[in-house]
Each structure stands twice: as C-alpha cells, then as structure tokens.
Amino acid sequence: MKEYQTITEVSGPLVYVETDEPIGYDEIVEIETPNGDVKRGQVLESSDGFVAIQVFEGTEGVGKDASVRFLGETLKMPVTEDLLGRVLDGSGNPIDGGPDIVPDDRVDIVGEAINPHAREYPEEFIQTGVSGIDGMNTLVRGQKLPIFSGSGLPHSDLALQIARQASVPEEEAETDDDEGSEFAVVFGAMGITAEEANEFMDDFERTGALERSVVFMNLADDPAVERTVTPRMALTTAEYLAFEKDYHVLVILTDMTNYCEALRQIGAAREEVPGRRGYPGYMYTDLAQLYERAGRIEGKEGSVTQIPILTMPGDDDTHPIPDLTGYITEGQIMMNRDLNSQGVTPPVNVLPSLSRLMDDGIGEGLTRADHGDVSDQLYAAYAEGEELRDLVNIVGREALSERDNRYLDFADRFEAEFIDQGFKTNRDIEETLDLGWELLSMFPKTELNRVDEDLIEDHYVEDVADEATAD
C-alpha cells in the first residue's frame, strides 16, 4: 500500500495527485480527510509523476491536506449465490438492512470479453409475458435487445413488468428433479429518482420477484462516478450466476442515457476533447464493453441476456446514444408516444422494432411451429392498416373498399387487443399466438398469403371469420 499527501487539485469528481512511482490504471484508492472521513476512488489516468482519481462518493470535504492510499488492486465485486433477494447501492453495498455479504469470490468488475470461438450462438426463447415482444420481436437467450423510449414514456413500468414476468418456458416445465438451469434477474438502475426507486422496490417486494433478483440502485443524487460503476457491478454479478452457478440471467439496465451523461460529465471534468454532442469519443467502445458481456459460453449451462433501456433525448433515434447502441446490439424495441397518448400499455410500436435473432429462438420445439408465419402476417396486415390510416385522412373512410376497411379494423383491434394488455397481464406464448390467430381470422383465408396452408387449416378461427363477414 502506497500513501501520499500530495494532492495538487480537486476539480468536480476528480482529484489530482503527484506520485513518485508508477500507479496502475483502474487501481482502487482510499482518500482520508483530516476529520477521518474515508472516500473510495479509482485511478482514471496515470502518467509519470501524475495521477487523476475519480471519487465515488464525491469530493466534498476533500482538500490538499487529505491522505491518498493506493491499494494495489482494481475494483472488485463480492459475488455469491446469496446475492439473490438483495438490494445494493450503485457501488455494490447492501442497502436493504440485511446482513453483510459473505462472498464466495471477489471478481474484477471490468470483466473479460468472451472468446468469440467459445461463444455459443444465442438461441432458445425467453418469455417476457408481453405480446408485443414475445410474438413480434422475440427475445432470445444470450441476446442483447435494447428498449428505446422517450422522456415521460412508461419504460420503468415495462422494465418492472419484464423483471416480474420473464421466464424460460422449458425450465417452468421441468419436473421436481431440479434438473436444468434456474432463471434469475439482475436489475441495474442508474440515475433514477427516489420516487422511482421506491416504486421499483414496492413492486419487487409485493410481487415476490425480489426472491430471484439482485437489484442495484444508483439514485439521481448519487455521484456521477458511481453511475459508471453500477452496470459493471450488475454484469459481474450476472456473469457469476450464469457461468459459475448455471443460472439463465436476464440483465435489465435502466437508464443508459443517465450512464452516458455521467461519461460526458466526467469527460468534461478531465477537459477531454468532446465528440458528437459533447459525449466522449470513446463512448462507442465503452458501451460495447457493457453490451458485449451478454451471451452464452460453450460448455456452460447458464447464459446472460441483456435488456438495456434508454430514453432518446427529444425522441431522436439519431442521437449518439441510441445510434451507437443500435450498432452494437441485436435489434431494438421502440416505445411510441402516440400509442401512449391513446392509452395503449405498454406502448410498443412493433413496426420499427426488430429482434435480429428472433428466427433462431422460435418455431417447433422452441415456441410453436406457426410462430414465424403468424408474426409475418401480423406485421404485413398492421403495416397495411397503418398506410390506410394515412389515406383515410385524405379521402375519408367512405371512399375505401370493404377490404381496406377490414384492414383498418384490424389495425385498431391489433392495438387494442394484442398490444394493449396493461402492465399487470402476463400472457404466455400460447395465449399470444392464439390471440394473433383470432385477429388474423378477420380476413378470408386467401388474404393470409404469408402463412402455410396447413397452419391455416389447423389454427384459423372460423367463428371470427363468420362474424367479420357478417359485419
């Protein structure tokens, strides 16, 4: 351990120290003020005779008379299976009044990239209970699928719904012999308000979801530096549960926009040359280091699946945060302000949404043999209904044909019955696909040109078709 009393400057969350020997990058630091307060920090920059330290608890009370101790190790997360059911702050310290954590191991939070040769291709279905995701943009085990939201949209409610309802159907079907991997959720909240934190905790405790979850909470009034640590703590915990304890882990990170704002704030304090819109030029690399920690490893039973949630400033999907996120991840779920204003919950707009790995996680033996065809036909019918809505604004509904009016009715029913399920309803994939067939049966069989004829014979609902014809 090396100790110095050579602080030269304190600037925002950063402390600058003169040293007479090399100090390691990312090394953990303790800063003790004259009145005995101890703050933790991390080496952000190290050069000959000079070190910049980012302080997790903020630099209030730190002056040039403070002592700086370099501990000779990087930041580590104490990991154990007993973390399930616990609530921690953004730095990994318990805040739920429970006992201290007795770790099985202490793991570097930076993590290591999964060897591409050792990666298994993501496949197998994760059920969220949300039809707009399960039916149309299926989440696959080992995937990273972000949710793009906007300010004021209920992305927090959707995050809680997914955390509460998510499951691996094949594990639900396991018998009592305890074979197979269990399912767990790691929930990392960054820069949230105290009101949101209370809402999250009330929901987790009321629904019993906390028992299979590890929750990390970084509040809006916590230091920005801690915000950069929180997702790494969460992912380190998820990797331990997945690859050491064979859990299938779903990691929900909200809000990644707050994380990127913390990067910008720290970059400004360091007087770095800014990139697009003031964000640091290395933000793409930084985000990739987080998102690429999702996946499956050959020979390991567990998996890490990620749902990062971000709010697009000004609903702009070309903003650097959603833009760079889209390059790294495997699709996106888009929330829509117009649907939200109509009272549709969750307001998921399926048309611009995409799950690039969906085809690998659906079909016979995974969900159901008709899943792909049903999804394709629902997309096509809803897209045509949306186009006709624009036409109605010009010529009026009376000018449209019977066929066109049927597509308009379908679009209305699709939003009202398929998408709008509320935040409390948990639909399994069978219910979702059956509902899809009920809606598609509004059309004559000849209109279902994206569905195999055998599947039409098996699932087409004749009663609905008769009602539609009568109308």
Curated annotation (Swiss-Prot):
Keywords: ATP synthesis, Cell membrane, Hydrogen ion transport, Ion transport, Membrane, Transport. It comes from the Archaea. CDD domains: ATP-synt_V_A-type_beta_C, ATP-synt_V_A-type_beta_N, V_A-ATPase_B. InterPro entries: ATP-synt_VA_C (IPR055190), ATPase_a/bsu_AS (IPR020003), ATPase_A1-cplx_bsu (IPR005724), ATPase_F1/V1/A1_a/bsu_N (IPR004100), ATPase_F1/V1/A1_a/bsu_nucl-bd (IPR000194), P-loop_NTPase (IPR027417), V-ATPase_su_B/beta (IPR022879). Its main location: membrane. It is found in: Cell membrane. This is A-type ATP synthase subunit B. Has multiple subunits with at least A(3), B(3), C, D, E, F, H, I and proteolipid K(x). GO terms for cellular component: plasma membrane; proton-transporting two-sector ATPase complex, catalytic domain. It is a peripheral membrane protein. It holds the Pfam family ATP-synt_ab_N. The keyword DNA damage does not apply. One of its GO terms (biological process) is proton motive force-driven plasma membrane ATP synthesis. The keyword Aminoacyl-tRNA synthetase does not apply. One of its GO terms (molecular function) is ATP binding. Belongs to the ATPase alpha/beta chains family. Component of the A-type ATP synthase that produces ATP from ADP in the presence of a proton gradient across the membrane. The B chain is a regulatory subunit.
